[in-house]
């Protein structure tokens, strides 16, 4: 009887816990608001994993409740002593196979989604991707457009409906590049170039941020990704090429020093005089100051 009362007391708290949970849902989470094929594939993976794990939890709690009620102590079985057993082959097979099946059910779609994210989205394989080098520094982001021969700091413009091949690297501590509505994060590391493919299906503004703590200015490492129509994107590129100042080596050396800066736009990029794969690029400011 006491066990039954305790169970119903716990059950009565369920509506309250749901209210508390839903209270944090007044604003849609960016991760659950996919705006591109990569983000959509990862969103589907999250939903599948959540549903599968919810089903498992539901089955466990149902079995737990049934066993508690059915095999609880009663006046008529106070003297019952269960027989001694040394194993149950069927049960041992079940509780070995079930976890294996669960892991397989989670692993297959996860592996497929992971490998798919390393390539141009299949919906856009016929479109040439725009290449953009992403460089993290303390505490800002630099975006270099090699073909367009321009560079921006702390903001990023891309054409909508076109795959973007990001080349991720760093001139400071390891960081992580993340635009939640367009896809998952990936690390930026010294002396390495990591590829990341993302795409925005339609024009809009998307928040990007650092997903790896990198010191006191970490909270300032946010940037805006604005997806434009192809016509507006081409117009913006042309305006930058014609009106923005050149990014000199001295100016670049100043930008990558630890500190917080605002938005900047240049009609050239630092890749013309710094090789991202070189040792010097790993800590550009350190090597420049030694000379």
From Swiss-Prot:
InterPro entries for this protein: CcO_II, CcO_II-like_C, Cupredoxin, CuRO_UO_II, Cyt_c_oxidase_su2_TM_dom, Cyt_c_oxidase_su2_TM_sf, Cyt_o_ubiquinol_oxidase_su2, QoxA
Annotated localization: Cell membrane
GO terms for cellular component: plasma membrane
Catalytic activity: 2 a quinol + O2 = 2 a quinone + 2 H2O
PROSITE patterns: COX2_CUA, COX2_TM
Highest taxon of the lineage: Bacteria
GO process terms (BP): ATP synthesis coupled electron transport
Keywords, alphabetical: Cell membrane, Electron transport, Membrane, Oxidoreductase, Respiratory chain, Signal, Transmembrane, Transmembrane helix, Transport
Membrane-protein topology: Multi-pass membrane protein
Signal peptide extent: 1-28
Coiled-coil stretches: none
EC assignment: 1.10.3.-
GO molecular function terms attached to this record: copper ion binding; cytochrome bo3 ubiquinol oxidase activity; cytochrome-c oxidase activity; oxidoreductase activity, acting on diphenols and related substances as donors, oxygen as acceptor
Pfam families: COX2_TM
Disulfide bridge map: none
Segments passing through the bilayer: 49-69, 91-111
Top-tier EC class: oxidoreductase
NCBIfam families, alphabetized: QOXA
Family classification: Belongs to the cytochrome c oxidase subunit 2 family.
Job of this protein: Catalyzes quinol oxidation with the concomitant reduction of oxygen to water. Subunit II transfers the electrons from a quinol to the binuclear center of the catalytic subunit I.
Protein name: Quinol oxidase subunit 2
Protein source organism: Bacillus cereus (strain ATCC 14579 / DSM 31 / CCUG 7414 / JCM 2152 / NBRC 15305 / NCIMB 9373 / NCTC 2599 / NRRL B-3711)
């Amino acid at each position: 009887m006491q066990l039954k009362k305790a169970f119903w007391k716990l059950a009565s708290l369920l509506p309250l816990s749901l209210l508390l949970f839903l209270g944090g849902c007044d604003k849609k989470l960016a991760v659950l608001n996919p705006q591109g094929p990569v983000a959509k594939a990862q969103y589907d993976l999250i939903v599948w994993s959540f549903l599968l794990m919810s089903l498992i939890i539901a089955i466990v709690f149902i079995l737990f409740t049934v066993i508690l009620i059915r095999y609880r102590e009663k006046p008529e079985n106070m003297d019952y002593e269960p027989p001694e057993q040394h194993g149950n082959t069927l049960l041992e097979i079940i509780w070995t196979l079930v976890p294996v099946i669960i892991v397989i059910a989670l692993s297959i779609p996860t592996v497929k989604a992971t490998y798919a994210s390393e390539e141009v989205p299949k919906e856009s394989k016929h479109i040439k991707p725009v290449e953009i080098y992403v460089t993290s520094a303390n505490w800002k982001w630099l975006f270099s457009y090699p073909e367009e021969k321009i560079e921006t700091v702390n903001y990023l413009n891309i054409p909508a409906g076109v795959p973007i091949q990001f080349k991720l690297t760093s001139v400071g501590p390891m960081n992580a590049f993340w635009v939640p509505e367009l896809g998952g994060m990936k690390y930026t590391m010294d002396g390495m170039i990591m590829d990341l493919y993302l795409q925005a299906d339609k024009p809009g503004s998307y928040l990007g941020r650092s997903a790896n703590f990198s010191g006191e200015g970490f909270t300032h490492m946010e940037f805006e990704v604005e997806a434009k129509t192809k016509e507006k994107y081409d117009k913006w590129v042309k305006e930058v090429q014609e009106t923005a100042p050149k990014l000199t080596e001295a100016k670049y050396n100043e930008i990558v020093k630890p500190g917080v800066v605002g938005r900047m736009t240049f009609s050239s990029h630092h890749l013309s005089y710094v090789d991202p794969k070189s040792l010097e690029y790993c800590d550009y400011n350190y090597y420049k100051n030694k000379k």
